[in-house]
């Protein structure tokens, strides 16, 4: 079962969430360089995805505690979509903001406010606790939203629409909007970074290099996976050269590390940074690394982002 807004826990993890490569890393890296050197935005132009017909679960958005989040609607190409948004702090200031895409069923949102253990905190609570504005957008076909799930394709446009909503709020600094995500959400935010330089920095935890590794029966790929371009346009490894803003990719060596290694091996893009966290799993990276990111974002106030992370710094922060 795919959970709304949450990746499976480490004890009962399904292989459809921590993906096993359909291709070995060496096969992926041999395949990707032979592809045409075009940007993801150019490659997507005019492409019509062929979606599988699937009955929507139509689960309404769960109501959050009003002191932490409100439910809003933002306009996207697929229609009016729901999101959780931090309330206006009411201090007259513009604050940095984080859009976060959860793992598992990343089209839907659910409980992102209950306390979670440090070893598996998928709520990204570090950012709101640091005083940042948080937005958790649901995407097309998720919850009771209009539109149909496309599995890492049209959802890219929805995330960008969420950013457009945020930048118009008088309590958000439009030049300091960040994007992050975990697992399937990590894959999606990496694709967003490959498609657009809209975000000041992007943080991708545990993405896959090639979405076919999720498996046709995972529920994450509602399209014909036998069509090469359907898979390719959703697979981050082919479009790393398109990235034009700072991107940080994190994963524990006990998690979905093969994908990180495959992308790190092929990438020559100085905007993309890959950090393998020795001894950590797919989940333990989240809470401590998000705390580190949040602290640094509060100091990231210049015209251009000054964020930097070393592998040793991140590892020590996770293991302490």
Ranges and model annotations:
Residues 42-92:
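N-terminal cap/lid segment of alpha/beta-hydrolase-fold proteins
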Residues 91-95, 100-147, 212:
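Short substrate-entry loop that stabilizes the transition state in hydrolases
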Residues 150-170:
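Alpha/beta-hydrolase active-site loop
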């Amino acid at each position: 079962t795919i959970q709304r807004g949450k990746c499976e826990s480490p004890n009962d993890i399904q292989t459809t969430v921590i993906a096993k490569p359909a291709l070995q890393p060496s096969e992926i890296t041999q395949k990707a360089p032979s592809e045409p050197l075009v940007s993801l935005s150019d490659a997507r132009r005019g492409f019509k995805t062929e979606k599988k017909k699937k009955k929507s679960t139509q689960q309404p958005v769960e109501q959050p505690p009003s002191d932490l989040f409100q439910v809003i609607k933002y306009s996207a190409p697929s229609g009016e979509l729901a999101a959780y948004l931090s309330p206006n702090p009411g201090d007259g200031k513009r604050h940095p903001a984080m859009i976060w895409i959860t793992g598992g069923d990343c089209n839907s949102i659910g409980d992102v406010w209950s306390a979670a253990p440090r070893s598996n905190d998928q709520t990204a609570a570090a950012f709101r606790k640091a005083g940042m504005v948080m937005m958790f957008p649901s995407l097309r076909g998720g919850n009771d939203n209009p539109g149909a799930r496309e599995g890492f394709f049209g959802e890219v446009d929805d995330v960008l629409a969420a950013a457009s909503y945020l930048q118009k709020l008088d309590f958000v600094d439009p030049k300091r909007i960040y994007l992050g995500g975990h697992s399937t959400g990590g894959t999606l935010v990496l694709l967003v970074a490959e498609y657009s330089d809209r975000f000041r920095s992007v943080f991708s935890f545990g993405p896959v290099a090639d979405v076919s590794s999720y498996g046709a029966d995972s529920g994450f790929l509602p399209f014909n996976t036998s069509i090469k371009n359907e898979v390719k346009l959703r697979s981050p490894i082919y479009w790393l050269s398109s990235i034009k803003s700072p991107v940080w990719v994190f994963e524990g060596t006990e998690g979905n590390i093969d994908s990180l290694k495959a992308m790190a091996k092929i990438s020559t893009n100085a905007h993309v940074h890959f950090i393998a966290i020795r001894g950590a799993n797919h989940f333990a990276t989240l809470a401590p690394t998000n705390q580190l990111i949040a602290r640094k974002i509060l100091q990231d106030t210049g015209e251009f982002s000054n964020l930097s992370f070393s592998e040793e710094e991140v590892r020590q922060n996770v293991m302490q």
